[in-house]
Amino acid sequence: KFNISEKDGLKYSKISGDTNKIHIDNLTGYNSIFGEKICHGTLVLIKILEKIDLLKIINDKNLFYINFNFAKYFKYQHPISVIKNKNIFNIYQEDQKKLTINFSLKKKIDFSNFKKKHSIVTFYPKKNKKISDIFIILNNLSKYVGTVYPGRFSIISEINIYFNKHSYLFDNKLKIISKKIDPRLPIIENQLTFKNYLVQFKSLERPIVKNNKKIDNKLLRNKINKIKYNALIIGGSQGIGKDVLNILSDNHNIKKFVTYNKNKISKKSNTIYPIKFNVFDKINTLDKIIEANSPLKIYYFASPKIYFDNTLPLSIKKNYKFIFLNFPSLLLERYKNKNITLFYPSTSNILENRNSYYSKIKKNAEHKIKKICLKYRIPFEIVRFPALNSRQSVSLTNPSPTSLNEYLKKYPKIINKIF
């Protein structure tokens, strides 16, 4: 696989008889060369270093084609005219004036019944032509990703550029570059100066990521291991809840009653009692759990995923309103004498739409929780993590490299307040 010298995020398969495609992946990731900037438009250049007469190779329309893989989140965008729009991409020759190859859809797609995880759309060249350098320009992608905020999944999750069995003729004759395009400028022929953006691939192996340092959870472990009473942990599938759950497995002094949804307990322990409980369940379910197990302390770590826009279906909105606003409040009111410690993760994202449905619910929830906690003198901590481009509850013991320094600063303070 080739590697690009910029940020990680692109995967290229070597063009050869065995691996006959160029693979561009991680278009949905926030920590990649495309990532959060994909909605600004991206240029991908396939530079064929030697002119090749395709007609002399094989008279096959499938010799060279492009495959777009649409992510499952595409269905939330309602893209009625995405495929019909011919400006999804353009193919330019090196002189930037002549359209080299026109592409057409292999088949029509019915978006009204979009239930598959992925939908693959393939474009074939209509005619075989003698080609030299090909420039593939993804135009105005902000129309198709649904939002300009990082963290949302893009519609186009990957792009594959395929060659047929004769692709060995392309071996060692290709050079690939990429360039982010300013969305405020129209894409016109004389605007593109590709020579300044060439990137030479120097290695066939992907480099080892050196910035994989993990925060030492010694402080967290020491705090939790001092707990000498039965405790009920609500949450734990992600983030600090998961860390607490795993560390509790080492503490054999007390009984731990841990609610879970899909998470797995990494270490077996005779004092860990998993209780299947979903925060979408009614509060009565939790009543039975608490009555049966009599925990002396309750920790709340639940943290739902982030959505940035106002396009959520009504059913999802109701669920998120419940999990953010109603459930923590009910929990505090109901069990205020049970020595609850509330840990409420609430990300502050600098690119978040402050007028979105999610933001309003989160703000109301924080205000209501703070009011109840102060009224009953319940220890609580509303944590605003550093601005992340993913869900708000990234593990404190294994944060993303982009937020590592911020977590190192905030980590001791957060843990001391929780425990």
Go through each PLM region and give its residues.
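Catalytic strand-loop segment that frames the active site of acyl-thioester-processing enzymes
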Residues: 1-37, 104-134
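Conserved glycine-rich Rossmann-like NAD(P)H-binding loop of the short-chain dehydrogenase/reductase
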Residues: 252-266
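C-terminal helical subdomain
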Residues: 382-383, 394-419
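Rossmann-fold scaffold of SDR-type NAD(P)-dependent oxidoreductases
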Residues: 234, 295-305, 344
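HotDog/MaoC-like acyl-thioester-processing domains
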Residues: 1-4, 58-121, 157, 161-235
